[in-house]
Amino acid sequence: MQKIVIYTTATCPSCIGAKKLLDRKKLKYSEIAVDKDPAKREEMIELSGRRSVPQIFINDKPIGGFDDLSALDRSGKLDSLLLKNE
């Protein structure tokens, strides 16, 4: 089973969009709220090299943000990535 982690903030529209996309695909994920925990924000930056949210990881591989996740989904590559990692 794939491990999906998404770093978010409470008021981020792209974070909400990413979670809706994952929910629509019935994928389970762990959400880490970086607006409530500065150490988790630093962890996200260290792992992804980015400061923006959301940051999405599948099996510890950085996927990027909502635009990146959406592009993978539209191209069919998200399903392939998830199947490959099952």
Please give the residue ranges for each predicted region.
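Local sequence-structure signature of Cys/Sec-based thiol-disulfide redox active-site neighborhoods
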Residues: 1-28
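Short alpha-helical
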Residues: 13, 39, 64
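Structural micro-motif
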Residues: 48-57, 67
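Non-catalytic, surface beta->alpha helical segment in thiol-disulfide oxidoreductase systems
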Residues: 58-85
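C-terminal alpha-helical interaction module
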Residues: 1-8, 41, 75-76, 82-86
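Thiol-based oxidoreductase modules, predominantly thioredoxin-like and allied folds used
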Residues: 28-40
